[in-house]
Amino acid sequence: MTPNMLGAYGDWANQNLPDPPRLSFRQPQFQNLDSWRALARARYRECLSGPAPSAKPIALVQHQIEFDGLEIEHLQWQLPYGPPTEALLLKPAKARGKLPAVVGLHDHGGNKYFGLRKITRITKDPHPLMLQHQERYYSGLAWANELARRGYVVLVHDTFTFGSRRIRLADVPGVIRNNQVEANPEAEDEIKAYNAFAGAHEHLVAKSLTCAGLTWPGIFVNDDQRALDYLASRPEVDATRIGCAGLSGGGLRTVMLTGADERIRCSVAVGMMTTWRDYLLNKCHTHTWMCYVPGLPLELDYPEILGLNVPNPILVLNNRQDSLFTLPEMERADQILSAVYRKAGAADRYKASFYEGPHKFDAEMQKEAFAWLDRWLKG
């Protein structure tokens, strides 16, 4: 027996995963792309078990600035649940006409105190922890700013449990926070203490949501779709040319949002591609509770969620030494998506690249990602 997350039960549990799953487009009975996608997407949305969709959010402009060649709006909107959502909308200064747009999806990174600030910059003096974060994962770049400067409208918002949407210490019982309080929230020691609490709190969030008939992905997909609603409504945005992109937890959100919403015309998922088998046997200990959708692995393999948007173009960027996944299962995910796109007659609209190095979305990878978005949203 190969050591795995379930020990002697691992092989038995793995045998419960059909390959291909029931609603995989790789199944021979599925020949009509449109009818398959309607069936599979409906089942995916059912498994997500998210909140009832609400109206397009009414965004209030908190303030506007011009920074480093960009016009930036600080926005806030209220969803039917939780604290207000903070967001940034970035676009080239003095831009004219309709522009392509991207929903920029921030990562997890074991840091729930921050959300949108992980991939944006609106001051020459950002928080020191965000400088460290961007240096570690993004070659020191705020990639949402970099993309906006290329001629995009980029919307970056805090999603469920991050940044402005985080669960506040004062709102949970003292027994689960060791009576910890937030006296000076922007202090580094308090941020690190909050993130330790938030990491330990994840299993309680997942349990509680299950008791409400909800899933964690169902909630963040709803958050992200409402942001998409707002972005598509902006007068400077061409709603037929909207994409999404993100690293890690942002890559997860890219996968899930792309699978759920046909308005996403181009996607770049970075550092978040593998198979359910990899999660099951090898790597669930390296991942957040945000990943899991009960029942879905019987219907679609993890990469096939992204494939629900075929023939819209998708780019997957992997790192060979990424400790969050095993390389064989990253490669198997590539084979699965390649098969889906070939069968749909859209092989040229799918690409996966494998880079050397650990978990990251560095400058070289950003260059490929931006070129892909340019090809399909500007071409």
Protein language model regions, located:
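N-terminal targeting or regulatory segments adjacent to alpha/beta-hydrolase or S9 domains
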Residues: 1-71, 79, 115, 150, ...
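Short glycine-enriched nucleophile-adjacent loop
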Residues: 251-262
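Mobile cap/lid helix-loop segments that gate and shape the active-site cleft of serine hydrolases
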Residues: 199-214, 218-227, 266-306, 311, ...
